[in-house]
Regions:
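Outer-membrane beta-barrel "beta-signal"
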Residues: 257-278, 447-467
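Repeated loop/turn-to-beta-strand initiation elements of outer-membrane beta-barrel proteins
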Residues: 102, 135-137, 227, 231-235, ...
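Residues on the lipid-exposed face of transmembrane beta-strands in outer-membrane beta-barrel proteins
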Residues: 94, 124-130, 170-176, 189-193, ...
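Outer-envelope beta-barrel architecture signal
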Residues: 86-92, 141-147, 181-187, 231-235, ...
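Gram-negative (and chloroplast) outer-membrane scaffold detector with strong preference
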Residues: 142-195, 329, 334-410, 427-429, ...
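Transmembrane beta-strands of outer-membrane beta-barrel pores
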Residues: 96-102, 130, 151-157, 191-199, ...
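Surface-exposed strand-loop-strand hairpins of Gram-negative outer-membrane beta-barrel proteins
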Residues: 101-123, 161-162, 304-327
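Residues that define the transmembrane beta-barrel architecture of outer-membrane proteins
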Residues: 88, 118-124, 162-168, 183, ...
Protein backbone atom coordinates (compact mmCIF):
# COMPACT_ATOMS: atom_id res chain seq x y z
CA UNK A 1 0.00 0.00 0.00
CA UNK A 2 1.42 3.47 -0.99
CA UNK A 3 1.75 6.15 1.65
CA UNK A 4 0.50 9.56 0.43
CA UNK A 5 2.34 12.58 1.92
CA UNK A 6 0.77 16.06 1.48
CA UNK A 7 2.50 18.37 -1.02
CA UNK A 8 3.02 21.11 1.57
CA UNK A 9 5.11 18.70 3.69
CA UNK A 10 7.24 17.87 0.66
CA UNK A 11 7.74 21.59 -0.02
CA UNK A 12 8.78 22.24 3.59
CA UNK A 13 11.30 19.40 3.53
CA UNK A 14 12.78 20.59 0.21
CA UNK A 15 13.09 24.18 1.42
CA UNK A 16 14.83 22.99 4.55
CA UNK A 17 17.35 21.13 2.45
CA UNK A 18 17.93 23.92 -0.11
CA UNK A 19 17.80 26.88 2.30
CA UNK A 20 19.22 25.85 5.69
CA UNK A 21 19.10 29.41 6.98
CA UNK A 22 15.33 29.53 6.71
CA UNK A 23 14.73 26.09 8.21
CA UNK A 24 12.32 25.53 11.04
CA UNK A 25 13.42 25.78 14.62
CA UNK A 26 14.67 22.67 16.44
CA UNK A 27 11.43 22.38 18.39
CA UNK A 28 9.30 22.52 15.25
CA UNK A 29 11.52 19.97 13.51
CA UNK A 30 11.19 17.59 16.48
CA UNK A 31 7.42 17.95 16.40
CA UNK A 32 7.34 17.18 12.69
CA UNK A 33 9.52 14.09 13.15
CA UNK A 34 7.21 12.83 15.90
CA UNK A 35 4.16 13.28 13.69
CA UNK A 36 5.86 11.46 10.79
CA UNK A 37 6.83 8.59 13.11
CA UNK A 38 3.27 8.26 14.42
CA UNK A 39 1.96 8.36 10.87
CA UNK A 40 4.30 5.53 9.85
CA UNK A 41 3.11 3.43 12.79
CA UNK A 42 -0.50 4.04 11.82
CA UNK A 43 0.27 3.04 8.24
CA UNK A 44 2.02 -0.17 9.35
CA UNK A 45 -0.94 -1.08 11.58
CA UNK A 46 -3.32 -0.38 8.72
CA UNK A 47 -1.27 -2.58 6.40
CA UNK A 48 -1.40 -5.42 8.94
CA UNK A 49 -5.18 -5.04 9.29
CA UNK A 50 -5.54 -5.10 5.52
CA UNK A 51 -3.52 -8.32 5.29
CA UNK A 52 -5.71 -9.99 7.91
CA UNK A 53 -8.84 -8.78 6.15
CA UNK A 54 -7.58 -10.15 2.83
CA UNK A 55 -6.99 -13.53 4.49
CA UNK A 56 -10.51 -13.55 5.89
CA UNK A 57 -11.93 -12.54 2.50
CA UNK A 58 -10.03 -15.38 0.85
CA UNK A 59 -11.46 -17.85 3.36
CA UNK A 60 -14.93 -16.49 2.73
CA UNK A 61 -14.44 -16.82 -1.03
CA UNK A 62 -13.41 -20.45 -0.57
CA UNK A 63 -16.57 -21.15 1.41
CA UNK A 64 -18.78 -19.37 -1.14
CA UNK A 65 -17.12 -21.42 -3.87
CA UNK A 66 -17.95 -24.54 -1.85
CA UNK A 67 -21.58 -23.53 -1.45
CA UNK A 68 -21.96 -23.05 -5.22
CA UNK A 69 -20.40 -26.42 -6.02
CA UNK A 70 -21.89 -28.31 -3.04
CA UNK A 71 -18.40 -28.95 -1.66
CA UNK A 72 -17.50 -27.20 1.56
CA UNK A 73 -13.78 -26.57 2.16
CA UNK A 74 -13.94 -27.07 5.91
CA UNK A 75 -17.22 -28.83 6.42
CA UNK A 76 -17.99 -30.81 3.32
CA UNK A 77 -17.50 -34.17 1.80
CA UNK A 78 -14.59 -34.03 -0.59
CA UNK A 79 -12.21 -31.08 -0.31
CA UNK A 80 -10.04 -29.30 2.20
CA UNK A 81 -9.30 -25.59 1.98
CA UNK A 82 -5.86 -24.95 0.45
CA UNK A 83 -4.90 -22.35 3.04
CA UNK A 84 -4.94 -24.94 5.87
CA UNK A 85 -1.33 -26.23 6.20
CA UNK A 86 -2.31 -29.43 8.04
CA UNK A 87 -5.60 -31.02 8.99
CA UNK A 88 -4.59 -31.28 12.65
CA UNK A 89 -2.37 -29.61 15.21
CA UNK A 90 0.01 -32.25 16.62
CA UNK A 91 0.96 -31.98 20.29
CA UNK A 92 3.27 -33.58 22.85
CA UNK A 93 2.63 -33.10 26.55
CA UNK A 94 4.01 -33.99 29.98
CA UNK A 95 2.01 -34.02 33.22
CA UNK A 96 2.61 -34.51 36.93
CA UNK A 97 -0.31 -35.80 39.01
CA UNK A 98 0.07 -35.91 42.81
CA UNK A 99 -2.90 -37.86 44.19
CA UNK A 100 -4.75 -38.71 47.39
CA UNK A 101 -5.70 -42.40 47.79
CA UNK A 102 -9.20 -43.04 49.13
CA UNK A 103 -9.10 -45.53 52.07
CA UNK A 104 -11.81 -47.75 50.60
CA UNK A 105 -10.63 -51.06 52.11
CA UNK A 106 -8.69 -52.28 55.19
CA UNK A 107 -5.48 -52.83 53.21
CA UNK A 108 -5.29 -49.17 52.22
CA UNK A 109 -6.41 -48.06 55.69
CA UNK A 110 -3.34 -49.65 57.28
CA UNK A 111 -4.01 -53.37 57.70
CA UNK A 112 -0.95 -54.34 55.70
CA UNK A 113 2.58 -55.62 56.17
CA UNK A 114 3.90 -52.22 57.29
CA UNK A 115 0.82 -51.33 59.35
CA UNK A 116 0.76 -47.91 57.72
CA UNK A 117 -2.05 -46.44 55.63
CA UNK A 118 -1.42 -45.89 51.92
CA UNK A 119 -2.67 -42.34 51.46
CA UNK A 120 -0.88 -40.86 48.46
CA UNK A 121 0.41 -41.64 44.99
CA UNK A 122 2.25 -39.84 42.22
CA UNK A 123 1.98 -40.29 38.46
CA UNK A 124 4.09 -38.94 35.60
CA UNK A 125 2.49 -38.86 32.13
CA UNK A 126 3.81 -38.54 28.58
CA UNK A 127 1.06 -37.84 26.02
CA UNK A 128 0.72 -37.42 22.26
CA UNK A 129 -2.45 -35.88 20.82
CA UNK A 130 -3.84 -34.17 17.74
CA UNK A 131 -6.60 -31.61 17.62
CA UNK A 132 -8.74 -29.83 15.07
CA UNK A 133 -7.57 -26.43 13.92
CA UNK A 134 -9.46 -23.46 15.35
CA UNK A 135 -12.21 -21.96 13.21
CA UNK A 136 -12.85 -25.16 11.28
CA UNK A 137 -16.15 -26.94 11.04
CA UNK A 138 -15.02 -29.79 13.31
CA UNK A 139 -13.68 -27.31 15.86
CA UNK A 140 -17.00 -25.48 16.03
CA UNK A 141 -19.09 -28.65 16.26
CA UNK A 142 -16.99 -30.52 18.83
CA UNK A 143 -15.57 -27.64 20.86
CA UNK A 144 -11.87 -27.91 20.08
CA UNK A 145 -11.75 -31.68 20.59
CA UNK A 146 -8.37 -33.39 20.80
CA UNK A 147 -7.49 -37.06 21.19
CA UNK A 148 -4.43 -39.28 21.46
CA UNK A 149 -2.64 -41.84 23.60
CA UNK A 150 -0.50 -41.64 26.70
CA UNK A 151 1.96 -43.54 28.88
CA UNK A 152 2.08 -43.13 32.65
CA UNK A 153 4.19 -44.35 35.56
CA UNK A 154 2.47 -44.47 38.97
CA UNK A 155 3.92 -45.12 42.41
CA UNK A 156 2.10 -45.57 45.73
CA UNK A 157 5.23 -45.65 47.88
CA UNK A 158 4.88 -49.40 48.53
CA UNK A 159 6.29 -51.36 45.61
CA UNK A 160 6.46 -54.65 47.54
CA UNK A 161 2.75 -54.87 48.40
CA UNK A 162 1.07 -52.81 45.67
CA UNK A 163 3.60 -52.35 42.87
CA UNK A 164 4.50 -49.40 40.65
CA UNK A 165 2.24 -49.89 37.61
CA UNK A 166 2.80 -48.63 34.07
CA UNK A 167 -0.31 -47.50 32.19
CA UNK A 168 -1.07 -47.20 28.49
CA UNK A 169 -4.27 -45.37 27.58
CA UNK A 170 -6.24 -43.44 25.01
CA UNK A 171 -7.74 -40.08 25.89
CA UNK A 172 -9.93 -37.30 24.58
CA UNK A 173 -10.59 -33.77 25.74
CA UNK A 174 -13.02 -31.00 24.82
CA UNK A 175 -13.35 -27.32 25.59
CA UNK A 176 -16.13 -26.54 28.09
CA UNK A 177 -15.83 -22.75 28.03
CA UNK A 178 -13.53 -20.21 26.36
CA UNK A 179 -12.73 -17.06 28.32
CA UNK A 180 -10.55 -15.57 25.57
CA UNK A 181 -8.58 -16.95 22.59
CA UNK A 182 -5.74 -18.03 24.93
CA UNK A 183 -7.59 -19.29 28.03
CA UNK A 184 -10.19 -22.05 28.21
CA UNK A 185 -11.74 -24.56 30.63
CA UNK A 186 -11.52 -28.14 29.33
CA UNK A 187 -12.42 -31.65 30.41
CA UNK A 188 -10.56 -34.87 29.59
CA UNK A 189 -11.10 -38.60 30.05
CA UNK A 190 -8.51 -41.40 29.96
CA UNK A 191 -9.15 -45.12 29.43
CA UNK A 192 -6.57 -47.88 29.26
CA UNK A 193 -4.81 -50.78 30.95
CA UNK A 194 -2.17 -50.79 33.68
CA UNK A 195 0.38 -53.53 34.32
CA UNK A 196 2.99 -54.16 37.01
CA UNK A 197 0.73 -54.51 40.04
CA UNK A 198 1.55 -56.81 42.96
CA UNK A 199 -1.72 -58.73 43.40
CA UNK A 200 -3.08 -60.69 46.32
CA UNK A 201 -1.20 -63.89 47.07
CA UNK A 202 -2.14 -66.19 49.94
CA UNK A 203 1.52 -66.94 50.70
CA UNK A 204 3.46 -63.80 49.76
CA UNK A 205 1.00 -60.88 49.72
CA UNK A 206 -1.95 -61.94 51.84
CA UNK A 207 -2.78 -58.46 53.17
CA UNK A 208 -3.57 -57.02 49.74
CA UNK A 209 -7.35 -57.03 49.54
CA UNK A 210 -7.43 -54.22 46.99
CA UNK A 211 -5.88 -55.75 43.88
CA UNK A 212 -6.30 -59.30 42.63
CA UNK A 213 -4.57 -59.20 39.24
CA UNK A 214 -1.32 -58.01 37.70
CA UNK A 215 -3.19 -56.17 34.92
CA UNK A 216 -6.03 -53.76 35.72
CA UNK A 217 -8.27 -51.34 33.87
CA UNK A 218 -7.53 -47.62 34.20
CA UNK A 219 -10.25 -44.95 34.19
CA UNK A 220 -9.65 -41.23 34.67
CA UNK A 221 -11.64 -38.03 34.24
CA UNK A 222 -10.88 -34.43 35.11
CA UNK A 223 -11.23 -30.74 34.32
CA UNK A 224 -8.47 -28.17 33.91
CA UNK A 225 -7.56 -24.70 32.68
CA UNK A 226 -5.58 -24.46 29.44
CA UNK A 227 -3.50 -21.30 28.98
CA UNK A 228 -1.73 -20.76 25.65
CA UNK A 229 1.56 -19.17 26.63
CA UNK A 230 2.80 -18.80 23.05
CA UNK A 231 2.45 -20.22 19.57
CA UNK A 232 4.13 -23.43 20.74
CA UNK A 233 3.44 -23.90 24.46
CA UNK A 234 0.30 -24.44 26.58
CA UNK A 235 0.23 -24.60 30.38
CA UNK A 236 -2.45 -26.73 32.04
CA UNK A 237 -3.58 -26.99 35.68
CA UNK A 238 -6.61 -28.73 37.15
CA UNK A 239 -7.87 -31.78 39.02
CA UNK A 240 -8.98 -35.34 38.26
CA UNK A 241 -10.31 -38.65 39.59
CA UNK A 242 -8.79 -42.09 38.87
CA UNK A 243 -10.07 -45.66 39.28
CA UNK A 244 -8.08 -48.91 38.93
CA UNK A 245 -9.83 -52.32 38.92
CA UNK A 246 -9.88 -55.63 37.05
CA UNK A 247 -13.55 -55.56 36.09
CA UNK A 248 -14.47 -58.46 38.39
CA UNK A 249 -12.36 -60.89 36.38
CA UNK A 250 -10.36 -61.89 39.49
CA UNK A 251 -10.73 -61.72 43.26
CA UNK A 252 -10.17 -59.59 45.23
CA UNK A 253 -11.47 -56.62 43.26
CA UNK A 254 -11.86 -53.78 45.76
CA UNK A 255 -9.87 -51.51 43.42
CA UNK A 256 -7.89 -48.35 44.04
CA UNK A 257 -9.41 -44.86 43.76
CA UNK A 258 -7.48 -41.59 43.79
CA UNK A 259 -8.08 -37.88 43.30
CA UNK A 260 -5.76 -34.91 43.07
CA UNK A 261 -4.14 -32.27 40.90
CA UNK A 262 -2.73 -32.33 37.38
CA UNK A 263 -0.09 -29.87 36.18
CA UNK A 264 1.51 -30.01 32.77
CA UNK A 265 3.03 -28.43 29.70
CA UNK A 266 2.02 -29.08 26.07
CA UNK A 267 4.15 -28.42 22.98
CA UNK A 268 2.25 -27.68 19.74
CA UNK A 269 4.36 -28.68 16.74
CA UNK A 270 2.57 -26.90 13.90
CA UNK A 271 0.28 -24.32 15.47
CA UNK A 272 0.13 -20.94 13.70
CA UNK A 273 -0.10 -17.49 15.28
CA UNK A 274 -3.45 -17.06 13.54
CA UNK A 275 -4.77 -20.04 15.52
CA UNK A 276 -4.49 -17.94 18.69
CA UNK A 277 -6.58 -15.04 17.37
CA UNK A 278 -10.32 -14.73 17.06
CA UNK A 279 -11.43 -15.06 13.45
CA UNK A 280 -13.88 -12.63 11.86
CA UNK A 281 -15.39 -15.35 9.67
CA UNK A 282 -17.01 -18.52 11.02
CA UNK A 283 -17.28 -21.66 8.88
CA UNK A 284 -20.67 -22.82 7.78
CA UNK A 285 -22.07 -25.86 9.64
CA UNK A 286 -24.55 -27.92 7.59
CA UNK A 287 -27.90 -28.63 9.20
CA UNK A 288 -27.90 -31.98 10.99
CA UNK A 289 -30.26 -34.57 9.44
CA UNK A 290 -32.18 -35.99 12.40
CA UNK A 291 -32.81 -39.70 11.98
CA UNK A 292 -33.04 -43.08 13.71
CA UNK A 293 -30.08 -45.43 13.53
CA UNK A 294 -29.85 -48.97 14.89
CA UNK A 295 -26.94 -50.32 16.95
CA UNK A 296 -26.33 -54.05 17.37
CA UNK A 297 -23.63 -55.06 19.86
CA UNK A 298 -22.34 -58.59 20.47
CA UNK A 299 -20.15 -58.97 23.55
CA UNK A 300 -18.49 -61.51 25.78
CA UNK A 301 -16.18 -61.73 28.80
CA UNK A 302 -15.47 -63.76 31.91
CA UNK A 303 -15.99 -63.10 35.60
CA UNK A 304 -15.46 -64.37 39.12
CA UNK A 305 -18.32 -64.66 41.57
CA UNK A 306 -18.62 -64.12 45.29
CA UNK A 307 -21.09 -66.52 46.91
CA UNK A 308 -22.69 -66.09 50.33
CA UNK A 309 -22.47 -69.09 52.68
CA UNK A 310 -24.43 -70.03 55.78
CA UNK A 311 -22.19 -67.92 58.03
CA UNK A 312 -23.17 -64.79 56.14
CA UNK A 313 -19.72 -64.34 54.65
CA UNK A 314 -18.99 -64.10 50.95
CA UNK A 315 -16.36 -66.38 49.46
CA UNK A 316 -14.91 -66.47 45.97
CA UNK A 317 -15.91 -69.10 43.46
CA UNK A 318 -13.13 -71.51 42.44
CA UNK A 319 -12.94 -70.40 38.83
CA UNK A 320 -14.13 -67.97 36.18
CA UNK A 321 -17.48 -68.14 34.43
CA UNK A 322 -18.29 -67.11 30.84
CA UNK A 323 -20.53 -64.17 29.96
CA UNK A 324 -22.08 -63.48 26.54
CA UNK A 325 -24.81 -61.17 25.36
CA UNK A 326 -26.23 -58.68 22.90
CA UNK A 327 -27.73 -55.18 22.80
CA UNK A 328 -30.06 -53.95 20.08
CA UNK A 329 -30.80 -50.23 20.34
CA UNK A 330 -32.80 -47.96 18.04
CA UNK A 331 -31.22 -44.53 18.64
CA UNK A 332 -32.67 -41.14 17.73
CA UNK A 333 -29.87 -38.89 16.48
CA UNK A 334 -30.82 -35.47 17.83
CA UNK A 335 -27.78 -33.48 16.69
CA UNK A 336 -24.07 -33.83 16.03
CA UNK A 337 -23.32 -34.80 19.65
CA UNK A 338 -26.39 -36.48 21.19
CA UNK A 339 -28.30 -39.72 20.66
CA UNK A 340 -31.16 -41.18 22.73
CA UNK A 341 -32.90 -44.52 22.55
CA UNK A 342 -34.10 -47.78 24.11
CA UNK A 343 -32.08 -50.99 24.11
CA UNK A 344 -33.14 -54.63 24.22
CA UNK A 345 -30.47 -56.39 26.30
CA UNK A 346 -29.94 -60.14 26.43
CA UNK A 347 -27.28 -61.90 28.48
CA UNK A 348 -26.05 -65.33 29.46
CA UNK A 349 -24.18 -65.12 32.77
CA UNK A 350 -22.50 -68.40 33.70
CA UNK A 351 -22.06 -67.22 37.28
CA UNK A 352 -25.71 -66.31 37.89
CA UNK A 353 -27.33 -68.11 40.83
CA UNK A 354 -24.24 -70.22 41.53
CA UNK A 355 -24.50 -71.61 45.07
CA UNK A 356 -22.71 -73.90 47.52
CA UNK A 357 -23.94 -76.91 49.43
CA UNK A 358 -24.61 -76.39 53.10
CA UNK A 359 -22.30 -79.25 54.00
CA UNK A 360 -18.55 -79.23 53.39
CA UNK A 361 -17.36 -81.88 50.97
CA UNK A 362 -13.99 -82.84 49.60
CA UNK A 363 -12.97 -80.30 46.98
CA UNK A 364 -9.38 -79.87 45.98
CA UNK A 365 -8.90 -76.21 45.12
CA UNK A 366 -6.00 -74.04 46.15
CA UNK A 367 -6.71 -70.51 45.07
CA UNK A 368 -6.13 -68.65 48.28
CA UNK A 369 -9.75 -67.59 48.39
CA UNK A 370 -11.09 -69.71 51.18
CA UNK A 371 -12.95 -72.04 48.84
CA UNK A 372 -11.21 -75.31 49.71
CA UNK A 373 -13.65 -77.87 51.04
CA UNK A 374 -16.74 -76.45 49.32
CA UNK A 375 -18.52 -77.56 46.21
CA UNK A 376 -19.91 -74.82 43.97
CA UNK A 377 -23.02 -75.85 42.08
CA UNK A 378 -24.23 -74.35 38.81
CA UNK A 379 -28.00 -74.27 38.18
CA UNK A 380 -29.75 -74.96 34.90
CA UNK A 381 -29.37 -72.57 31.96
CA UNK A 382 -32.86 -71.16 32.55
CA UNK A 383 -31.45 -69.57 35.73
CA UNK A 384 -28.57 -67.94 33.83
CA UNK A 385 -30.41 -66.18 31.00
CA UNK A 386 -31.95 -62.72 31.23
CA UNK A 387 -33.67 -60.25 28.93
CA UNK A 388 -33.96 -56.60 29.84
CA UNK A 389 -34.90 -53.14 28.60
CA UNK A 390 -32.78 -50.06 29.21
CA UNK A 391 -32.87 -46.40 28.33
CA UNK A 392 -29.70 -45.25 26.57
CA UNK A 393 -28.00 -41.92 25.97
CA UNK A 394 -24.86 -41.31 23.91
CA UNK A 395 -22.40 -38.45 23.73
CA UNK A 396 -20.93 -38.49 20.23
CA UNK A 397 -17.44 -37.18 19.54
CA UNK A 398 -14.84 -37.75 16.82
CA UNK A 399 -13.55 -41.35 16.91
CA UNK A 400 -15.25 -42.10 20.27
CA UNK A 401 -18.79 -42.33 21.64
CA UNK A 402 -19.67 -42.53 25.35
CA UNK A 403 -22.77 -44.62 26.13
CA UNK A 404 -24.69 -44.80 29.43
CA UNK A 405 -27.78 -46.84 30.21
CA UNK A 406 -30.24 -47.62 33.00
CA UNK A 407 -32.48 -50.67 32.77
CA UNK A 408 -34.15 -53.64 34.39
CA UNK A 409 -34.44 -57.30 33.49
CA UNK A 410 -38.01 -58.20 32.56
CA UNK A 411 -37.07 -61.88 32.28
CA UNK A 412 -34.61 -63.29 34.80
CA UNK A 413 -34.40 -65.24 38.03
CA UNK A 414 -32.55 -64.82 41.30
CA UNK A 415 -29.34 -62.85 40.84
CA UNK A 416 -30.55 -61.52 37.49
CA UNK A 417 -33.46 -59.54 38.95
CA UNK A 418 -33.28 -55.84 39.68
CA UNK A 419 -31.86 -52.72 38.11
CA UNK A 420 -28.66 -52.62 36.08
CA UNK A 421 -26.48 -49.81 34.77
CA UNK A 422 -24.29 -49.78 31.67
CA UNK A 423 -21.24 -47.60 30.97
CA UNK A 424 -19.53 -48.12 27.62
CA UNK A 425 -17.00 -46.63 25.23
CA UNK A 426 -17.52 -47.13 21.50
CA UNK A 427 -14.43 -46.74 19.32
CA UNK A 428 -15.15 -46.16 15.64
CA UNK A 429 -13.59 -48.68 13.25
CA UNK A 430 -15.54 -47.86 10.09
CA UNK A 431 -18.60 -45.75 9.40
CA UNK A 432 -20.85 -48.71 10.24
CA UNK A 433 -18.83 -50.64 12.86
CA UNK A 434 -17.16 -50.00 16.21
CA UNK A 435 -15.38 -51.67 19.11
CA UNK A 436 -17.40 -51.86 22.32
CA UNK A 437 -15.77 -51.73 25.78
CA UNK A 438 -18.31 -51.55 28.58
CA UNK A 439 -19.15 -52.49 32.13
CA UNK A 440 -22.37 -53.59 33.80
CA UNK A 441 -23.29 -52.71 37.39
CA UNK A 442 -26.20 -53.97 39.47
CA UNK A 443 -28.23 -51.66 41.71
CA UNK A 444 -25.63 -48.87 41.31
CA UNK A 445 -23.08 -50.68 43.51
CA UNK A 446 -22.48 -54.36 42.75
CA UNK A 447 -19.92 -55.08 40.01
CA UNK A 448 -21.33 -57.40 37.36
CA UNK A 449 -19.27 -58.06 34.23
CA UNK A 450 -17.23 -56.59 31.42
CA UNK A 451 -18.79 -56.13 27.98
CA UNK A 452 -16.05 -56.58 25.36
CA UNK A 453 -17.34 -56.84 21.83
CA UNK A 454 -18.04 -55.55 18.36
CA UNK A 455 -20.91 -53.33 17.25
CA UNK A 456 -22.64 -52.55 13.98
CA UNK A 457 -24.64 -49.43 13.10
CA UNK A 458 -27.43 -49.51 10.52
CA UNK A 459 -29.16 -46.61 8.74
CA UNK A 460 -26.36 -44.26 9.72
CA UNK A 461 -27.01 -40.83 8.18
CA UNK A 462 -24.51 -38.94 10.31
CA UNK A 463 -22.84 -36.28 8.09
CA UNK A 464 -19.19 -36.65 7.15
CA UNK A 465 -17.42 -33.82 8.94
CA UNK A 466 -14.06 -32.89 7.46
CA UNK A 467 -11.34 -31.53 9.67
Amino acid sequence: MRVKIPRWEIAVICSALLFPGTSLSAQEVGQEEKEVKEMRQDVEQLQQDVRQLREEVRRLQEEIHGFRHNSFPQCGADTVAPYVPHHFIHRLGIEARPQYVFPTNPFLQGENERWKPIQSSFAAHLKYSFKFRPNTCADRIYGGAYQGFGLAFTTFGDKKQLGDPMTFYVFQGVRIARFNPRLSLNYEWNFGISAGWKPYDNDYNSYNGAVGSRVNAYLNAGIYLNWSLSRYFDFIIGGDFTHFSNGNTKFPNAGVNTTGAKIGLVYNFNREESDLTKSLVKPYIPRFPRHISYDLVLFGSWRRKGVYVESGKQIASPGSYPVAGFNFAPMYNLNYKLRFGVSLDGVYDGSANVYTEDRIVEYDYDGGSGTSGRRFLVPGIQHQLALGLSGRAEYVMPFFTINVGLGTNVLGRGDLRGLYQVFALKINVTRSSFLHIGYNLQDFQTPNYLMLGLGFRFNNKYPKVRH
